[in-house]
């Protein structure tokens, strides 16, 4: 510090402008603060008008409770709020805002006009400020019950901040994303957005499941809703509900991930880790899951006052929340079966043919198709009923899959060897298919094999195409995981124990979780305050870098209270075994073998994706086929 410098108080205008650096980053930041105030006021309709991406004009109008004339000047003062009174109030705060600094920060870097009227007032009142002039001017105005906030010329008095703004389209995209997030958080509020005089978004109140799904589709796209699983699970004071996208609807960027805690949009590391773990086995490298999820818990179980923008939260029982999120999502993804995608069939469903025989149908080298023969039975499809809309959604079939049983390790290894050896064409027996005419399995009955790669099958909805290698790879992988779980992990003692230098905190963590490491095949011994010895590692991971793996696991344990790194390494090895053991392309399968593969798919968790996240099968309904041939036009 210079000897001539003296300590002095900063002016209110300067302190507000400094604070604005945390609160007001761009027009989207302003929109977030104003919209949250509107929602906290009990608004049921919010209109947003924007010009030039929000830099020239951002106007937010609501029909909330309004602000009285006496409180208007105070509303623009820093740290003035109606939402908390004592420090203890923060433990149970449910409002989106509570610090009372947003309007003061915004008014210090823009020209702000606030007009409001309460239900008990006969007229509205208006207050204006212009950046440098921090003395508010209050005057009567015409306005319905509610509040309008108009922000013009953002950063007009701070040119350095204005230079960091992006192009108009970029700024508007950020602003629009803020509105989308809040519209997902509050289905009971209508949102309307206009940009440069053009209507961009119009969302009406959504009070039932259908309307909520329609709003999610309008914001996230119809493709998401078509590929999303609805979930709603409540346990031990925690409730998780919303929609999770199927792994086949993953994206190259994490731009379709919305997570809300008690109605507040958050981006939390613990939440992200739990979701990533749940999708671990079904996503291709570099792909990101999609979801719109809502977590509800007691307000005192989460601290929302840990980040200037309130994007991050801290859970009181972080480990319990993590395990609940992971377990719920993991189970939801694992329970997806083919029949979940086939809740209805087309109205013009044809008869299903059950071919049996020693040789599969296939396409020959010249492209001609050789059908399996002989065709012994043609069970009749049960009569379907047309729904009110005439779409054929009333068609129902009955099929009860056999219960899935844990596979002993010996059997899993036998299956691995059986599918890895060349096929003996004479060994295939007759197909074992349901005898009841009404028992049409979700994936139907195999018809033929295409180019030694795909299985063509017919079900109640139409045509099913199966990538036989990808499907069998998933089946083998799940069986090997079950086998490992039942047999446990054998350890490989090291001839020369490896020494590992750590911080004292990491060494304490390793000692605390010693039994957990032992169950996974590791034996760790503490040699000193900051030294560990690795005496044993899992036999399957003998080629892994033990030191680095243990350090990474300890980092996870200290951050999240759990780690999936060891299991991820093991699963990677099992996935390689399953890939090598799965039926190969250009291998001819008999009809009974193809049908056996279809039945195994119906009874295997996550069978819709291979180990790398690629789809294993797809459905083409009769409507899809009709469109290809222009039928019905």
Curated annotation (Swiss-Prot):
Protein's UniProt keywords contain DNA damage: yes
Keyword DNA repair: yes
Xref: HAMAP family: DNA_mis_repair (MF_00149)
Protein name per its UniProtKB record: DNA mismatch repair protein MutL
GO cellular component annotations of the record: mismatch repair complex
One GO term of the biological process aspect: mismatch repair
Record lineage: Bacteria, Pseudomonadati, Pseudomonadota, Gammaproteobacteria, Pseudomonadales
PROSITE patterns referenced in this protein's UniProt entry, alphabetically: DNA_MISMATCH_REPAIR_1
């Amino acid at each position: 510090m210079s000897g001539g410098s003296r300590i002095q108080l900063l002016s209110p205008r300067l302190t507000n402008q400094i604070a604005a650096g945390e609160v007001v980053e761009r027009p989207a930041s302003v929109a977030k603060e104003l919209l949250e105030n509107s929602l906290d006021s009990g608004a049921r309709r919010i209109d947003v008008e924007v010009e030039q991406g929000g830099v020239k004009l951002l106007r937010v109008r609501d029909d909330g409770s309004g602000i009285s004339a006496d409180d208007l000047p105070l509303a623009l003062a820093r740290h003035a709020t109606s939402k908390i009174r004592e420090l203890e109030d923060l433990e149970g705060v449910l409002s989106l805002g509570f610090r009372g600094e947003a309007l003061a920060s915004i008014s210090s870097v823009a020209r702000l006009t606030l007009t409001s009227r309460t239900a008990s007032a006969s007229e509205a009142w208006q207050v204006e400020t212009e950046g440098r002039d921090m003395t508010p001017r209050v005057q009567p105005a015409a306005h319905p019950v509610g509040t309008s906030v108009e922000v013009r010329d953002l950063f007009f008095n701070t040119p350095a901040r204005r230079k960091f703004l992006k192009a108009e389209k970029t700024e508007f995209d950020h602003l629009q994303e803020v509105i989308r997030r809040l519209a997902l958080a509050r289905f009971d509020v209508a949102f309307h957005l206009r940009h440069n005089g053009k209507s961009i978004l119009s969302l009406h109140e959504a009070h039932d499941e259908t309307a909520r799904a329609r709003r999610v589709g309008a914001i996230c796209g119809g493709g998401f809703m078509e590929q999303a699983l609805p979930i709603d699970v409540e346990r031990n004071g925690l409730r998780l509900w919303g929609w999770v996208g199927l792994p086949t609807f993953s994206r190259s960027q994490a731009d379709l991930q919305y997570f809300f805690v008690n109605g507040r949009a958050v981006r939390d590391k613990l939440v992200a880790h739990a979701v990533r773990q749940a999708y671990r086995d079904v996503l291709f490298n570099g792909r990101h899951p999609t979801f719109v999820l809502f977590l509800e818990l007691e307000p005192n179980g989460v601290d929302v006052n840990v980040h200037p923008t309130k994007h991050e939260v801290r859970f009181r029982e972080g480990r319990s929340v993590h395990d609940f999120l992971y377990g719920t999502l993991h189970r939801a993804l694992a329970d997806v079966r083919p029949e979940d995608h086939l809740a209805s069939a087309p109205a013009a469903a044809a008869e299903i043919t059950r071919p049996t025989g020693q040789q599969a149908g296939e396409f020959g080298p010249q492209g001609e198709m050789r059908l399996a023969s002989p065709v012994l039975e043609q069970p009749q499809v049960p009569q379907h009923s047309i729904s009110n809309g005439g779409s054929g959604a009333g068609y129902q079939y009955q099929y009860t899959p056999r219960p899935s049983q844990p596979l002993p390790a010996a059997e899993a290894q036998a299956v691995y060897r059986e599918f890895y050896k060349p096929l003996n064409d004479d060994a295939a027996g007759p197909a074992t298919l349901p005898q009841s005419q009404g028992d049409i399995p979700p994936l139907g009955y195999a018809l033929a094999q295409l180019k030694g790669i795909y299985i063509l099958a017919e079900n109640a909805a139409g045509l099913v195409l199966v990538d036989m290698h990808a499907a069998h790879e998933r089946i083998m992988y799940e069986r090997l995981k079950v086998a490992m779980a039942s047999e446990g992990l054998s350890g490989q003692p090291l001839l020369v124990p490896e020494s590992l230098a750590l911080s004292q905190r990491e060494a304490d963590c390793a000692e605390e979780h010693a039994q957990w490491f032992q169950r996974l095949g590791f034996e760790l011994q503490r040699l000193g305050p900051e030294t560990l010895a690795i005496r044993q590692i899992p036999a399957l991971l003998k080629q892994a870098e033990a030191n680095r793996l243990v350090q990474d696991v300890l980092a996870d344990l200290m951050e999240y209270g759990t780690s999936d790194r060891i299991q991820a390494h093991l699963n990677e090895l099992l996935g390689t075994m399953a890939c090598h053991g799965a039926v190969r392309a250009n291998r001819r399968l008999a009809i009974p073998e193809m049908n056996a593969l279809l039945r195994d798919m119906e009874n295997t968790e996550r069978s819709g994706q291979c180990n790398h996240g690629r789809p294993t099968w797809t459905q083409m309904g009769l409507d899809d086929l009709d469109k290809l041939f222009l039928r019905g036009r």
